[in-house]
Design a protein with these regions (language model features):
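Oxidoreductase cofactor-interface core, primarily capturing Rossmann-like NAD(P)-dependent enzymes
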Residues: 1-87, 94-103
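A hydrophobic C-terminal alpha-helical subdomain
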Residues: 93-156
Length: 156
């Protein structure tokens, strides 16, 4: 069984993407807490590998990730790719509960307290045939550098 961590594609959620393109990565995960992500295409590569080599995966739980960054580090990556400053802003947890509900509140509380624990260096060593994308590689492959040109900077 493969267990993917948070999807890099979550950055396409409207409010998240618009905020980033306007220079603000807003997230309820603490600034000092590493957050693991993976590209959906990398999940597909692992699924294909599991079918090709079932003996390695049957009865096993393999947590998979390609990137591990704190939110300030992720903001720096977005800044490099977009060619303009992106700053991290921590969202207060009570806002998460109020606007997103109990389930999202519990999920982000878990991210802040524990979070995913995929061993990325070990995954890269054990499965060299799968190129696990870093956040920067994924952003560039997805064309985020072009997206930045279509959004006006915030006033003020």
């Amino acid at each position: 069984m493969i267990r993917p961590v948070a999807f890099m594609e979550n950055y396409y959620i409207d409010q998240v993407e618009i905020g980033i393109l306007k220079g603000k990565l807003s997230d309820p995960i603490r600034a000092d807490k590493p957050y693991q992500t993976i590209a959906a295409s990398d999940i597909g590569a692992f699924a294909a590998l599991a079918f090709e080599r079932p003996k390695e995966f049957i009865g096993e739980a393999v947590e998979i990730a390609g990137s591990e960054l704190t939110n300030p580090e992720a903001a720096q990556v977005f800044s490099r790719v977009l060619g303009k400053p992106v700053k991290f802003q921590k969202l207060p947890m009570p806002m998460v509960r109020l606007f997103l509900g109990k389930e999202f509140y519990q999920m982000f509380r878990w991210f802040n307290q524990s979070g995913f624990k995929a061993n990325i260096p070990e995954l890269r060593r054990k499965y060299p045939e799968i190129h696990l994308q870093t956040l920067e590689e994924w952003l560039r492959a997805e064309g985020w550098q072009k997206r930045a040109r279509r959004v006006r900077p915030p006033k003020g």
